[in-house]
């Protein structure tokens, strides 16, 4: 089982998500409940987004916690959370623009998907990256993780420390970072003869899963 609710709650609070709903706050983040094909190899078309929550205050994050956990355990889902908080105003504006574009081109089927599509692809207000350290990339995961963290800190960045936090995942860790010099990072990894992990911009990290190993 992986339960990152406490760590993520603190993380989004530091990014400006208020405790209670505040009309003056433009920020939100989304949580997706996803069924992964590798968790259900016997199911056809197993990759599926079961539900998405749009959260703009910690009260709602707390409110939906139990529901998210129950859904994950009942249906074998993983809960993922966006690492970048987003703008409600920009989401509304981009949705209107996309509706207008679709209608101009004669496309009006399934309009309810437009908002979800906009939110899923929307840039964050403050860019954070996910560095995916997987146990498949190394023999010793903990040693590999520390090597990657040290290598990131050796790169040029606009921030004193590009490392924000480390999140446990089902098969390793996600290092959430500020942007850093990727080319420099790859050269450092090559010099150390370590496999550079995948770097994912505007991505998601694991909030919760309790899937039994096959």
Show which residues each predicted segment covers.
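A common structural junction motif
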Residues: 156, 189-199
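Signature for HUH/AEP ssDNA processing cores
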Residues: 1-169, 180, 187-188, 204-214
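Short hydrophobic/aromatic beta-strand micro-patches
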Residues: 176-178
